[in-house]
Amino acid sequence: MTNVVVIGSQWGDEGKGKIVDWLSERADVIVRFQGGHNAGHTLVVDGVSYKLALLPSGLVRGKLSVIGNGVVVDPHHFVAEVEKLRAQGIAVTPDVLRIAENAPLILSLHRDLDALREDAASNSGTKIGTTRRGIGPAYEDKVGRRAIRVIDLSEPETLPAKIDRLLTHHNALRRGMGLSEISFNALHEELTSVAEHILPYMDQVWRLLDEQRKAGARILFEGAQGALLDNDHGTYPFVTSSNTVAGQAAAGSGLGPTALGYVLGITKAYTTRVGEGPFPCELHDEIGKHLSTVGREVGVNTGRPRRCGWFDAVLVRQTVKTSGITGIALTKLDVLDGLDELKICIGYRLDGKEIDYLPSSQAAQARVEPIYITLEGWKESTVGARKWADLPAQAIKYVRQVEELIGAPVAMLSTSPEREDTILVTDPFEG
């Protein structure tokens, strides 16, 4: 038995929700370790759909769910998401949900700054494509050592000084942007009004997880977004504001790296991306439209359409290395049904030279051209397949080619949005 880290191996939206739900039924503890409420996913349990963005997926199954210190927590969204789950009959109490006392808070001033910057960048043609939910500015305050954290809400005697320090920074920014300043009283009221809703869930998460590990609990670390959006290893600056690679599961939860275990990379059978940034295999033709339409490629949280393209083995192979992926869960294979031929990117051409990696340079990333191999497609349906024998021969060939090119085996194969439509090759908890 081992613990499991689940991450997206591409730019997010790989289908983590279904796989995490499948695994969470077998887990004892589910942990969020990075990001905020900027990446949503939908779980379908007994025919009921649950849309989550901040809360761990294990809540819908009554499992102990933990929001780690690596997550930035919007208290207003937290309350709204909890209330929505309760309205759907899910019990959300401190018995099943814990929040790290050292998790930073996202406040209204962070959302304001995020939106203002994105608007300014849009006007200058340099926008990143953020969700405008304050994630980036909240992480900036964390790194700048001025963030207000969950535990600060429990110490009213020291909170005023922390508010002053935060406002000194933000009001200087607002003055420079021609905006009115935020008053001490307004921010103090915002914080005190949410304290009673957050503090009952506060805990020393690092200690809790260590105790659970020693007791033999199966711990599932639930990553958000994708490794190619990692602040260090992604397509910088078109990335998120946190680390999304598997190593962050340790830093963002307080449980040491030796406890992480199996790393499962959720990998879509083609490639999608939301927002701005390089996308070497992007398709603007009828195939791209097919992938978008059949794959229903629209963001759960934002409603933004996703850009679509062929499978990029170069990128996933790189993620396998940077995240130490043990095996992948290949999703949305059924979206490829009916295509006459399929292409897989096996390398890039940069200024006339062939390379087998994505360069770090933003300019070089924009210039790379994909090198493809072409495989025969299949006409049969793979929808609902639950064993290898149900798959067309060409579909199996496609899967084997992906394994060979990325240097990692397929541990799970998803053939529809339904959780039961999954071919299990290797149980990550037993891996």
Swiss-Prot record:
Q: Where does IMP bind?
A: 13-16, 38-41, 131, 145, 225, 240, 304
E.C. no: 6.3.4.4
Q: Which Gene Ontology molecular function entries are recorded, alphabetically?
A: adenylosuccinate synthase activity; GTP binding; magnesium ion binding
For the ligand (substrate), the binding residues are: 300-306
For this chain's UniProt record, which GO biological process terms are given? Answer: 'de novo' AMP biosynthetic process; IMP metabolic process
Q: In which pathway does it act?
A: Purine metabolism; AMP biosynthesis via de novo pathway; AMP from IMP: step 1/2
- Top enzyme class, one word, equals ligase
Record's subcellular location: Cytoplasm
Q: Which UniProt keywords apply?
A: Cytoplasm, GTP-binding, Ligase, Magnesium, Metal-binding, Nucleotide-binding, Purine biosynthesis
Q: Name one GO cellular component term.
A: cytoplasm
Identify the cofactor(s): Mg(2+)
Q: In UniProt terms, what function does this protein have?
A: Plays an important role in the de novo pathway of purine nucleotide biosynthesis. Catalyzes the first committed step in the biosynthesis of AMP from IMP.
Q: What is this protein called?
A: Adenylosuccinate synthetase
